[in-house]
Amino acid sequence: MKPEYTSDELLPLSGLQHFCFCRRQWALIHIERQWQENVLTVEGKLLHNRVDNPFFSETRNGVITARSVPVASYRLGLSGVCDVVEFTSSTEGVRLPGREGTFSPAPVEYKRGKEKQDHSDEVQLCAQALCLEEMLSISIPVGSFYYHEIRHRVELELTRQLRDLVGEIALEMHAYFQRGHTPRVKPSKACRSCSLEDVCLPALQDQVIPASKYIQQQIEDG
């Protein structure tokens, strides 16, 4: 892995979820700067608006809850904002300004629906933890999700396999971004819930031919 990226090279951490869902969707949003909203994205944004309150923190049952925490990893080349970071008193933790003792951090990601079948949520949460680890020089073994639809909290172990996967995806994202390349993908059922279906036009992708082949056909037909 590239040892370190510059500030100008950092990609949005939120793009990891788009990339896992569909590489083409990610490229349309982050390379071509396309964006469309559907019911799912609007509901998700409303939930995050309730969570996001910059620089706000509270203490309950000995746990310090910080909201909208900016994070970055120059090793992964990612930056973003954690919905919530919980700091629990620990002898092996970090010191916080204005607080006595040391605390262990853990990211908590708020989600609109229920647990997904793919690994996109896990990748995003793990990336947040990796950013915090790099910034605070501490190991973070677990993170958590709170699923709004089912009012349920789920803890996630941040395994070596998951950490390696985040690194691989980050590298692939940077490779596409540096080339300015929007990949083609096979249409699937997931396309129906994609906020960019009208921009992507997945049903037409199989009909698209490379420009070089089109020119060659015109020469042969002429």
Residue ranges and their predicted role:
Residues 1-107, 207, 217-222:
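Metal-dependent nuclease catalytic cores that hydrolyze phosphodiester bonds in DNA/RNA
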Residues 6-9, 172-188:
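Short, intrinsically disordered, charge-biased short linear motifs at domain edges
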Residues 6-7, 15, 152, 181, ...:
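Glycine-rich, flexible loop/turn motifs
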Residues 22, 181-222:
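Cysteine-cluster motifs in flexible loop/terminal segments that predominantly coordinate metals
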Residues 37-39, 176-177, 212:
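A short hydrophobic/aromatic micro-motif that marks alpha-helical segments and, especially, helix-coil
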Residues 75-76, 134, 185:
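A general structural signal for stabilizing positions within well-ordered secondary structure
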Residues 79-80, 86-180, 192, 196-198:
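Nucleic-acid nuclease catalytic cores
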